[in-house]
UniProtKB/Swiss-Prot annotation:
Pathway annotation from the record: Cell wall biogenesis; peptidoglycan biosynthesis
Species the sequence originates in: Streptomyces avermitilis (strain ATCC 31267 / DSM 46492 / JCM 5070 / NBRC 14893 / NCIMB 12804 / NRRL 8165 / MA-4680)
Record bears the keyword Cytoplasm: yes
One GO CC annotation: cytoplasm
Name of the protein in question: UDP-N-acetylmuramate--L-alanine ligase
Residue positions binding ATP: 117-123
Top-level taxon of origin: Bacteria
Biological process, per Gene Ontology: cell division; cell wall organization; peptidoglycan biosynthetic process; regulation of cell shape
Native organism taxonomy: Bacteria, Bacillati, Actinomycetota, Actinomycetes, Kitasatosporales
Length: 464
């Protein structure tokens, strides 16, 4: 049976409880019997899902939202130091716990699988959660996105396995001690926290050093950054299992065959060929499934059982999620916000769509990312037949002088892309309705609130 409540976490208060990572931890604590409370900037389906579990969720941040008897205050790196609930916690002497420390405590006593990498963490974690659940292993899991319904990003299971995303953005993945660690890829991102690839490699090396004695590192064989990390950690003595299409991979991907919005994957593992279906399109998602397969095998689960169970995975919200179809136009939501992710999703859709036109509504995420990768984002958009580019979604950042979406638009046009800038999101449904024709695919793409436009575009198309 999974352990109970960590010490001093029986009455936690979460600042920003509606966030993907925070809400998952809050949900697991509530399911373990904690009296959970918290606050968030706005009302959401996630807040409602937490209330259904007995949590108290306040909208807005105010000192009075923090109960005097709270045993700890949980924060993420996105919470600013001047938050009034943080100030109140200091007055009351209530300890402040980072989200990553809270998650690490939840994994104590279990067999953790930590999924790391610049791209693909949510999908791979979800694949593991679904396949292990399908096999009756009742894992606990904490995912950075909902599987199929609000609040489905986390679960307290009665089994002894805990699957979690391991976030490198703020180095919080250094807090975990996994039995199995997955590294999907290693690239420069999160430019506010990392100045160079050497800093990125050093951070991932620290993560690998945290693998428990006798544990396993599952790492991509095809990705340049992952191969370099493998070279750097080989001397540490950790058991390494590589996967990919490279001939020297321990788990060798023999083929990935597109079948509409699905893929058939054939792998060679320990001399045995296995074939299974992944219910989302794209070679990158097929590789994520192979990483999940290798991680499960590292924990002693039969490969054939895992291969069959992976077919139960039907996707996660915002990862090439079909939102609907109107007037012969399908609208699909993509979380891609880094050029590598954008390219992978657009190539996947091109393989699935055949001759259909692909229209993209892209919202850049973060000024710092646009400053460093804006040119590459524009080049990725050249893979679409036409694109609408919105203003930058700031998230936690303040504006950077001179950094706007125009950097992306100029690069896209230089690469031959058809790009339309739109500054008012409210205009997007009409703009897309004027561009789209039956048979087209429309992708809303980005990590910000561009996802809200999918239903609005469908509504506008229904009135054509």
């Amino acid at each position: 049976m999974a352990p109970g409540l960590p010490t001093a976490m029986d009455r936690p208060h979460f600042i920003g409880i509606g966030g993907a990572g925070m809400s998952g931890i809050a949900k697991i604590l509530a399911q373990r019997g904690a009296k959970v409370a918290g606050s968030d900037a706005k009302e959401s389906e996630t807040a409602e899902a937490l209330r259904a579990l007995g949590a108290t969720v306040h909208i807005g941040h105010a000192a009075e939202h923090l109960a005097d008897d709270a045993t700890c205050v949980v924060v993420s790196s996105a919470i600013r130091a001047d938050n009034p609930e943080l100030a109140r916690a200091a007055e009351l002497g209530i300890p402040v716990v980072h989200r990553s420390d809270a998650l690490a405590r939840l994994m104590d006593g279990l067999r953790p699988i930590a999924v790391a990498g610049t791209h693909g963490k949510t999908t791979t974690t979800s694949m593991l959660a679904v396949s292990l659940s399908t096999l009756g292993l009742a894992p606990s899991y904490a995912i950075g996105g909902d599987l199929d319904a609000p609040g489905s990003n986390a679960l307290h299971g009665e089994g002894d396995i805990f699957v979690a995303e391991a976030d490198e953005s703020d180095r919080s993945f250094h807090k975990y001690a996994p039995d199995v660690a997955i590294v999907l890829n290693v690239e420069l991102d999160h430019h506010a926290n990392y100045a160079s690839m050497d800093e990125i490699y050093a951070s991932f090396e620290t993560f690998v050093d945290r693998i428990t004695e006798g544990g396993t590192l599952v790492i991509a064989a095809d990705h340049e950054g992952a191969r370099e990390l493998t070279r750097r950690v080989t001397a540490s003595g950790v058991r390494v299992v590589t996967y990919g299409e490279s001939a020297d991979a321990d788990v060798c991907v023999l083929s990935v065959t597109a079948q509409g919005l699905k893929s058939e994957v054939e792998v060679l593992l320990d001399g045995t060929e296995l074939t299974f279906t992944v219910s989302v399109p794209g070679r990158h998602y097929a590789h994520n499934a192979v990483a999940a397969l290798a991680a499960g095998v590292a924990l002693g689960i039969p490969a054939a059982d895992l291969a069959s169970a992976l077919a139960a995975y039907t996707g996660v919200k915002r990862r090439l999620q079909l939102k609907g179809e109107e007037a012969g136009v399908q609208v699909i939501d993509s979380y891609a916000h880094h050029p590598t992710e954008m390219t992978a999703d657009l190539e996947a859709m091109r393989a699935a769509a055949g001759d259909a036109r692909i229209l993209v509504v892209f919202q850049p995420h973060l000024f710092s990312r646009t400053q460093e990768l804006g040119k590459e984002m524009g080049q990725a958009l050249a893979l679409a037949d036409a694109s609408v580019v919105l203003d930058i979604y700031p998230a936690r950042e303040d504006p950077i002088p001179g950094i706007t979406s125009e950097l992306i638009i100029e690069a896209a046009r230089a690469a031959g892309a058809d790009v339309t800038p739109v500054h008012d999101k409210a205009e997007v449904p009409s703009v897309i309705a004027g561009m789209a024709r039956p048979g087209d695919l429309v992708l809303t793409m980005g990590a910000g609130d561009v996802t809200e436009l999918g239903p609005r575009i469908l509504d506008r198309l229904s009135k054509q």
